Amino acid sequence: MIQPNDYSHFDIPTIYVGYDPREDLAYRVLKHSAHKHASGPLNVFPIRQDNIRRIGLYRRAWELGSSNLPKPENDADIQHRDQFDGRPFSTDFSFTRFLVPFLHRLEGWALFMDCDMFFRSDPLELFRKYNDDKYAMYCVKHNYHPTETIKMYGNEQYDYSRKNWSSVMLFNCGHHGHKNYTVDDVSTKPGRWLHNLLWLEDADIGRLPEEWNWLDGHSPADLDAKNVHFTRGGPWFRHLSWSPVSDQDEMYAQEWENLATEIKQQ
C-alpha cells in the first residue's frame, strides 16, 4: 500500500480529464484548481477524442439527430446518439473515459474526472488514502436519478443505474479485475455496460466519500465538498440551461467563476 508522500514505484500521480472542445474553459478551471491545491507533483491530461481516434484507440460510431426534442438553435446542440445502442450521449468523453487503464499502461493508479468539476482540496489526498490493492477502482456510489428531462446542449437526459459513478473513477490499472477488459470493449460494448462497470465484480469497486464527487442539486448542502461536480450544467451555462437550486450551489458557482477569472488574468 502506498504510504503518504511515497510514489517511488509509481509515476507522478496523474489525472485524466474528459475533454470536450465546447467546454474548454471548464477543463482549464479544473486543471488550474488541481494544481492550485496539490501538495506535490501532479500530472493533468485531457482525453481528446480526436487524438485517440487518430492513434487507433477509439473508433466508436455515433450520429447526429434522431431527437424528439425541439429543433436546436445550432449544430453544436443537435442530439448525439450512439450507433451501438441508440442511446443519447452529450459529451465527447461519454465513453473515452473508459480508456484510462490503457492510457496508463495497465499499471499503477490513475484518476478520471469529468471536466465540469473543480477541486477545493488537495487531489493528492485521493492517491494517498484510497489505494487498497484489493480494489480495481474507487468511486462515489451515488444513488442519483435526475428529474430533468433535458440536459446541456438541449440533449435528452437519460437515467440508468449507477449514474454518476463513472464521473470520478480512481483506477487501479493493473488489477486482475481488468484482465479480460480490452481496448475494443470501449468501442463496441453498450454504454450501459461501460457506465455500470460490468466487467468488474461488485466487490472490486471501492467506495469514495461523497465529498469527492459533490453533485449540484443533489448532494447534501452541509457536506463540505472537496471536489464539486456541476452535473446539471455549471455556471458557464448561466442563463441558458443551468441555475443554482441552493445557496450552496451558488457559493460553489462563484468559487468556480473566481478560478475562471484567475485563469483569464494569467
Regions found by a protein language model. Give the residues of each.
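Short, well-ordered alpha-helices that flank and scaffold nucleotide-derived cofactor binding pockets
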Residues: 32, 36, 128
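A glycosyltransferase accessory/donor-loop signature
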Residues: 1-22, 28-29, 39-40, 46, ...
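Conserved catalytic core of nucleotide-sugar-dependent glycosyltransferases
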Residues: 128-194
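Short, structured active-site "lid" loops
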Residues: 61-97, 102-104
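Short secondary-structure capping micro-motifs at structural edges
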Residues: 86-88, 98-99, 124-127, 151-158
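GT-A fold catalytic core of metal-dependent nucleotide-sugar glycosyltransferases
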Residues: 95-145, 170
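Short, solvent-exposed loop/edge-beta patches enriched in aromatic
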Residues: 10-11, 36-41, 103-111
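Alpha-helix N-cap/loop-to-helix initiation residues
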Residues: 23-24, 119
